[in-house]
Amino acid sequence: MSQKKSPRFELRSGNVDALLLALNTADLDAVRDDLLSRFESTPDFFSDDVVALDLRRLEGTGALALDRVIDTLATLKARAIGVVARADQRDWAGGFGLPLLDSQSRRGGKDEAPKEKAGKPEATAASGQTDAEAAGNTGKGKDSEGAAVNGKASEIAEIMAAANAASAPRAIPTLLIDKPLRSGQQIYAQGDVVILDLVSYGAEVIAEGNIHIYAPLRGRALAGVKGNPDARIFCTCLEPELISIAGIYRTAEQTLPADVLGKSAQVRLADEKLILEPLRMK
C-alpha cells in the first residue's frame, strides 16, 4: 500500500455532534407515543438533527424492533445515524440498516450506560464518534509510532490541531426582531432572540436559547428547544397561547396566575415544572 499523501482527501480523527436517545424501556410503542406527545407540538425541535439510539440501559430484553423508533424519529424530522449497544446486544442491534457506533466509555474498555438520570425519557445531547473515527484513532496510534522514525511528528500535530479547531464551539449571535409577528409567522433562533414588537395570536417564536419580548406575547413562545433547561422566557406583557421550555409546556387552557397575566413576567424551569413569576425591575 502506498504511503504517499494525497492532495485530494484527508483522513483524520474527529468528533461528530449528535443527539443520544437513551431508551429506558423495551416498550417501544410507549417510547413512540411519548416522543410524539413531547415533540409534535414543536415541529422544528430536531430540525434534521442526527440521533444515535443508545440501548445500554436495557437489560434482558432480547431483540427489539428498533425500526419503530427510527420511523418515529423520521416523522419528527430527525435522522437516526447509528446504534450504541453493549457487547451482548450488538448481534441484533446492527440489523436495522444503521451502523454500530462505539462510545467513548466502550472504547475505554467498559460498556457503560450514560450517567444521566435513568428516569428522564428524553433525548440528551452528546458528542459521539463513529466506528470509522475509532478506526482513525487506532491508526493515529500507529502513525505516532512511525512518526519518530519517519520524521512526521509535525504532520500529526498539524492534523490534531485542525481537528481541535474544527470541534471548537462557535459563538451564535442574538437574533433581533423589530417588527410585529403576525398570525402564521414563525421565527427560529439558534441562540437567544430579542423581539421589540407584538407577537400576535397564531405567531410562533422558537429559540434554542432565551426569548426576550419587549411587547405583548399573545402567540406561542418555545425556549430551549434543544433541551436546554436553563433557558428562560422574558416578556413585558404575558398573554400567551403556549409557553414552553425544553419541551415542558403550558397552554392558554390553564389560566395564568393573576400576578403575571398581562404583566411583565419571566418563565423558567425548575424540577421539570414551569415557574411563572413577576419580572421585578431593580
From Swiss-Prot:
Keywords: Cell cycle, Cell division, Septation. GO terms for biological process: cell morphogenesis; division septum assembly; regulation of cell division; regulation of cell septum assembly. Residues 104-120 have a biased composition (Basic and acidic residues). Pfam families: MinC_C, MinC_N. The keyword Cell division applies. Coiled coil: none annotated. InterPro entries: CAP/MinC_C, MinC, MinC_C_sf, MinC_N, Septum_form_inhib_MinC_C. Residues 103-147 are annotated as: Disordered. The keyword Cell division applies. Interacts with MinD and FtsZ. Belongs to the MinC family. Cell division inhibitor that blocks the formation of polar Z ring septums. Rapidly oscillates between the poles of the cell to destabilize FtsZ filaments that have formed before they mature into polar Z rings. Prevents FtsZ polymerization. HAMAP family: MinC (MF_00267). This is Probable septum site-determining protein MinC.
